[in-house]
Design a protein with these regions (language model features):
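Catalytic cores and adjacent flexible loops of soluble metabolic enzymes
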Residues: 1-223
Length: 223
């Protein structure tokens, strides 16, 4: 994650401690996708410079829009493993698509295995059939979209479905209360922005916990 606490120095020191304890692989889990690309590159460069034998993996979600640039910075700094996705589940609040990342790495001169497009399309077809059959009922359609609003609040895209469902549940009650006070009612977008602002405000007051389960739900619920 990214905050006044979670700096490059903080993560570099943490990695050094883990390696000293015997870790052979370090995974940078950028669960909300708000890690700044240049900072991620600095972290990986430090690890690979001091410990070239350590395998470095990057896992970052696409919600706020940093992930493609982050993957490029991590790769250029010596990253080894990158978590990607494929259609129809790539992008949105998930991961960049393997095709895009593969072509980007090739353009930078990295050796990347060729994608079996026949297998890709078959897996794509099967996944879409599951979504059309039953899986789609459990996926909020707005999770298909990226949102720069997530940059400030730092919430992971994976919890957006439950967050939006929760807002729907309280929306009418909030507007009823506002109306009783003679105040203007809020539409869903206005309510969402206010919640994001409140998360951004309350997060440091709760100690800047990494916004991943269960802390992301806790911070969101307090907000």
């Amino acid at each position: 994650t990214h905050s006044q606490v979670h700096t490059a120095e903080y993560y570099i020191n943490m990695a050094e401690k883990l390696i000293a304890e015997g870790a052979q692989e370090i995974c940078l889990k950028d669960m909300a996708g708000i890690g700044r690309p240049t900072v991620l590159g600095q972290i990986v460069k430090s690890i690979k410079t001091n410990h070239p034998e350590i395998v470095v993996q990057y896992h970052g979600h696409t919600g706020p829009g940093f992930s493609v640039a982050s993957m490029l910075e991590v790769a250029k700094a010596g990253g080894d493993v990158f978590d990607v996705a494929m259609e129809p589940l790539s992008w949105g609040m998930v991961h960049p698509d393997v095709i895009t990342i593969s072509e980007m790495f090739k353009a930078e001169g990295f050796k990347v295995p060729e994608i079996n497009m026949k297998a890709y399309m078959e897996a794509r077809r099967l996944t879409q059939s599951f979504m059309d059959d039953f899986l789609g009922y459990f996926i909020d359609p707005r999770n298909r979209f990226m949102s720069s609003l997530l940059v400030g609040c730092g919430l992971p895209g994976g919890m957006m479905g439950s967050l939006l469902a929760g807002l729907k549940g309280v929306h009418a009650g909030i507007n009823s209360n506002l109306k009783a006070q003679g105040k203007a009612e809020l539409n869903e977008d206005e309510l969402l922005v206010q919640l994001f602002d409140e998360v951004k405000y309350i997060w440091p007051k709760l100690g800047n916990p990494p916004l991943v389960t269960p802390f992301s739900q806790y911070v969101k619920n307090v907000a």
